[in-house]
């Protein structure tokens, strides 16, 4: 943080130069985190619409990037959720083309809405010292690449 402040004092409004002081992996993490936020927001809305159905087929949800086009989406409800999310966030898929830092440009992808949780084990259940009259659980499981444990845990404990 101090290096960035110093850089900006010396170089005025060269924000791209200041951001380049942050390691590349960390800068990419910022972009990918925002894409994951969008994915989760879209997924949550899709599941709210389909709540109460006995069975929802697994579909692919987009990870919004510069090459995303709504025309690739066959499900009209999903298409509307994506458009609504993009409008609410005041973004365009083209915003993921970062001309001042092309190394951060992200094309996006698709990810399954549902994934298989393998080897789920409850290792321990005990009193929660932070939340009176509550229990805590220590669990273990394996997820496929690009799936988030937080999402799986939220689903398990709903």
Where are these regions (language model features)?
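Non-catalytic, substrate/partner-engaging modules appended to enzymatic cores
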Residues: 1-158
């Amino acid at each position: 943080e101090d290096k960035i402040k110093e850089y900006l004092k010396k170089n005025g409004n060269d924000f791209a130069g200041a951001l380049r002081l942050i390691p590349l992996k960390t800068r990419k993490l910022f972009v990918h985190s925002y894409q994951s936020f969008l994915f989760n927001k879209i997924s949550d809305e899709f599941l709210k619409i389909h709540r109460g159905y006995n069975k929802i087929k697994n579909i692919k949800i987009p990870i919004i990037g510069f090459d995303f086009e709504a025309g690739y989406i066959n499900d009209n409800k999903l298409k509307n959720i994506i458009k609504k999310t993009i409008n609410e966030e005041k973004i365009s898929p083209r915003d993921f083309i970062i001309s001042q830092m092309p190394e951060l440009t992200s094309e996006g992808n698709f990810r399954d809405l549902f994934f298989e949780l393998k080897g789920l084990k409850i290792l321990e259940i005990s009193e929660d010292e932070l939340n009176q009259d509550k229990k805590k659980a220590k669990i273990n499981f394996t997820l496929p690449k690009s799936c988030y444990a937080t999402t799986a845990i939220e689903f398990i404990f709903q």
